[in-house]
Amino acid sequence: MGSTIPKQFLDLNSKPILMHTIEKMHQSLDHSEIILALPKSEFDTWKKLCQEHQFKVNHQVVEGGVTRFESVSNALKKVNEQSVIAIHDGVRPLIKTSVVNGCMQTALEKGTAIPVIAIEESLRQKTDSGSVVVNREEYLIVQTPQCFSSEVLLKAYQQDYSPTFTDDASVVEAMGIEIQLIQGNKDNIKITTPEDLKKAQVYINLMSE
């Protein structure tokens, strides 16, 4: 991102990206418990930001790990009752309430749900001799929140870590459980570059008009 500030703390429309994300999830899942995984070294910074911005959305903070798997594992230690769990990237503040609710409802009924969108650009696969075109209709872009019944997710995270675990769905799928797909929203971008941040600012401005 070209900044020493962790990307989730970067300013978006006068407050940190992470606050937008938490507020959106809180609005979508009223009365739900929010658990935030952060590196321990960022605890004090987050506390200070919450004070500066008078951030009032109730949430717990747990220590994140080196990998996503470790961070989610630590957060799951706070789950002590049967429920549906939504795991969302802190730098995806533009998720639509309808997508969150759709994921949660599908997970409630079928145990799993993740949002996906179609690929609109051409794809090529690397080969030893160069590359070959692939059928983009056979691939999807995966987003978050990824939602699961607590029974399914807690059992999945009892597995040993594998480098093949790129997201929560891959952890659950490793147990042989089918992942249900729902339609995501295209503007639910993961803010990882300066260009992403500019796009998010445009979307935020349009949403506030």
What do these predicted ranges mean?
Residues 9, 18, 75, 88-89, ...:
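Residue-level signal for inorganic ion chemistry
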Residues 132-142:
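A recurrent flexible, glycine/aromatic-enriched loop bordering the glycosyltransferase active site
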Residues 32-34, 112, 178:
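Residues at the starts of beta-strands that form the adenosine-phosphate
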Residues 140-209:
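Conserved alpha/beta core of the MobA/IspD/sugar-nucleotide pyrophosphorylase nucleotidyltransferase superfamily
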Residues 54-66:
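Conserved donor nucleotide-binding strand/loop of the catalytic core
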Residues 67-129, 143:
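Conserved beta-loop-beta/alpha segment of the NTase-like Rossmann-fold superfamily
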Residues 44-49:
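Acidic helix N-cap motif at the loop->helix transition within catalytic regions
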Residues 1-43:
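N-terminal glycine-rich phosphate-binding loop and ensuing alpha1 helix
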